[in-house]
Amino acid sequence: MTDLHIPAMPIRVSEARGGDSLSGNLDDTVFNRLLKERIIFLGSEVTDQVANRICAQLLLLAAEDPDRDINLYINSPGGSVYSGMAIYDTMQYITNDVATIAMGMAASMGQLLLCAGAPGKRYALPHARIMMHQPSGGMGGTASDIAIQAEQMLYTKRMFQERVAFHTGQDSAQIEADSDRDRWFTAAEGLDYGFIDRVITGATQVPTGAGTRN
């Protein structure tokens, strides 16, 4: 779910799993090894902490080699719009092609990041599910505060729809209608809609060469 707010205190991986620091160290080892292969993994809700890590990894890999592709694997239920847009903007900012691969679930903000991958390099595994809906968030305070929050909500909704329309080739009116409520897509349906360019079954189907953007 794409929210306008995030929890004040994100739960650490080891705490969420009921483990100890050893599990956290193992996760770090795996993710660092993947990073050496130019693979970034988004496998959780999109929070400030997660977005800062992914943005830093994108910038690091771009600095190491501004031409080689970066592979972003996505298994996410969504999260904060603002945190997600930081990742989105960084993907567009660097010169590298960022290939996106959906596995499990790419929902809400995860869906936007999936379709924002480099043209021709947006993929999904056969049983991945893609979900699109409009941003949501709570409102409170005085009448003036609520009016300001409502205006911001409408701006965010329009921006989100315009970005999805741009990357899928659908028009904004169609995106608005289709995202009014949760809409789920299979990988094949996501291909037809324009979220992805190909349904893949093996890692060899994801190219690892130089990017094509100018």
Q: PLM features: residue spans?
A:
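N-terminal organellar transit peptides
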Residues: 1-109, 115-214
